[in-house]
Amino acid sequence: MIACVQMKLRAEDYRTEQSFATRIMGIMERIRREAGEGPLLVVFPEHIGTFCILSNAPERIWSKRTFAQASTALLLHNAGAVLHQMLVHRVSPVRALFLARAQEMERIYLTPFIDAAQKFQAWIVAGSAALRWGQTSRVFNTAPVITPLGHVIYRQHKVNLVEMEQRAGLDLEPAPLNYVSAVRSPFGALGVAICLDAFHGEVRGRLQELGAEILIQPSANNHPWDDWQQEDWLRSSYAAVVKHKEFGLAVNPMLVG
């Protein structure tokens, strides 16, 4: 069975690492119960882990009205570590905040998915998060693939960034096209194209060349689902599978709210 998770963004799911873990494990428990026994692939939406940067933050940060305000307060709360990263790597304050919080944020984000993969014997594409690449100053929108043994066997970085991910927003880095690869699984070869990447023919073409059979498109959208948006979305997974016959199947989970 393949499960596609549409998840509504709720602040209370990120307040602590325990609340995030409870949310993920609850979703996985329900999916396994509905699926019964047998092979299981679960795909979560884009940026599901990015908001883990706020987990375990003091109440004064959570009292802010918007994510932008809370992020600014978090930056000031971590001013010393942020300044250190800015000086060492010569990066923006936003990038420096991701670097300063990288190790804890990745732990909070990935641990529940690893535990869930093992407990429920599932392959999981854990949506995505803004993650540091090793010990470099590079931060990508990254989608991890996890096996039922709890091994993170692959991390796909996003190639084409939307405006809020670029320098004036989250200050993420676009990945080169040659970072795109396919992942072998019992369900067939998985090709992960994070949100906007699935709209781009060069990304889908590379996945085809690498033998991908299932297109995985973790997405996030906080805009109204109006007529234009619905029509425009047909240019991604739908076009790849129905119109162009590039893949046998596509999975497109969405983070909303």
Predicted regions and their residues:
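CN hydrolase (nitrilase-like) catalytic-core segments centered on the catalytic cysteine
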Residues: 109-125, 195-257
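Catalytic-core segment of enzymes that process non-peptidic bonds
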Residues: 67-191, 246-257
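Aromatic- and acidic-residue-enriched segments that line the glycan-binding/catalytic groove
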Residues: 54-69, 145
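Active-site beta-strand/loop signature of hydrolases that rely on acidic residues for catalysis
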Residues: 2, 26-60, 82-87, 93-101, ...
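Well-ordered, non-membrane alpha-helical segments in soluble/globular domains
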Residues: 16-30, 103-111, 229-240
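A Trp-anchored, charged/polar loop motif used as the substrate-binding/catalytic surface
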Residues: 25, 174-182, 188-202, 231-232
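Active-site-proximal beta-strand elements of phosphoester/diester hydrolases
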Residues: 1-17, 155-157, 188-197, 216
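Short catalytic/ligand-binding loop motif for oxyanion handling, primarily in non-cytosolic enzymes
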Residues: 12, 50-54, 133-136, 224-225
